[in-house]
Design a protein with these regions (language model features):
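Polar, enzyme-active/binding microenvironments
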Residues: 1-300
Length: 300
């Protein structure tokens, strides 16, 4: 700010250090294609494939920044599920029952148990969503209704029911997303893809593309500052979004896809995977150190 009395201009400078991934504690239940949301120190891993990807699990675990602990099971085991919220108030929605069958089931977490809520208008799995959404406001977009059919329809959640409101420009499945219900980014998807679209609360706009095409990635952050990491085929790369462009930063220790993700651009979390060789219960923590200082400039 500028002080008219002293003729001094004070500026705030933020300096970012080198970003890194480091190992965290393993999940109790190995899984992939699960819902993941929360923060680096308070994350949720919900349902998904089990150890050998031969069946789905009802298991729900929470991460406290140092270890995972089991909580109450969900009502319906599923994979290809997405979610949003916190460890005290979460929401999961959509599912793949088998390669040719999907569902629109919704469940809400109240810090004690899961309860069944209204289903989506269009059943789908492997969709895009806003990981920073809440139990009162979030969205689901695109995904799959069959292995070869991808709806472009978007639905918003108001705490009670789903409503169709808009369509994404390019329909696809296995896309990742970050942000909130009125301001979000979705990236990548089937093929794999480099496509990125931005949501402003009323419509979707295609914006700057990813550097590396990917699908089945995880993501974290807000519309103007986010991360996309991992993805198929067994990608380790992390890309950071600054509101206008993507920059490749630190790689995961192990490339993986169908992983869960949560957190921010400076403190993210990656957990689980579809590929057995990548450690289906492995957790990695992303850290991008930053320092903030004030600079005073005299005005002549």
């Amino acid at each position: 700010y500028y002080n008219t009395t002293t003729n001094l201009l004070k500026l705030t400078k933020t300096v970012f250090g080198t970003a890194t991934w480091s190992s965290g504690s393993n999940m109790g239940t190995p899984r992939g294609s699960h819902a993941g949301f929360g923060t680096q120190s308070a994350s949720s891993a919900v349902s998904g494939y089990d150890q050998d990807a031969s069946a789905v699990t009802v298991n729900y675990e929470e991460y406290d920044g140092s270890s995972w602990s089991e909580k109450a099971n969900v009502n319906t085991a599923r994979y290809g599920v997405v979610g949003c919220g916190t460890t005290t108030a979460g929401l999961i929605y959509g599912q793949v029952v088998n390669p040719s069958t999907v569902g629109g089931l919704t469940e809400e977490w109240n810090n004690t148990s899961w309860s069944v809520k209204n289903v989506m208008n269009t059943s789908r799995g492997n969709s895009g969503t806003a990981g920073g959404g809440t139990t009162e406001a979030t969205f689901v977009v695109s995904g799959q209704v069959s292995p070869s059919s991808f709806p472009s329809a978007m639905e918003t959640w108001n705490g009670t029911s789903w409503t169709e409101v808009s369509e994404i420009n390019t329909a696809r499945r296995n896309l990742s997303g970050f942000g909130v219900s009125t301001a979000a980014i979705v990236a990548g998807g089937t093929s794999p893809s480099i496509l990125v679209e931005s949501w402003n609360g009323s419509s979707w706009t295609e914006i700057t593309e990813l550097n590396t095409a990917a699908e089945e990635s995880a993501a974290s952050g807000i519309q103007t500052s986010g991360l996309v990491f991992g993805g198929a085929p067994n990608i380790a790369r992390t890309e950071e979004w600054n509101g206008s462009s993507w920059t490749e930063v630190a790689d995961l220790a192990t490339g993986r896809n169908q992983l869960g993700g949560s957190g921010t651009t400076t403190a993210g979390l990656a957990f689980g995977a579809e590929n057995p060789s990548g450690g289906r219960n492995a957790t990695e923590e992303f850290t991008a150190p930053q320092s903030i200082s004030n600079v005073t400039v005299a005005s002549s």
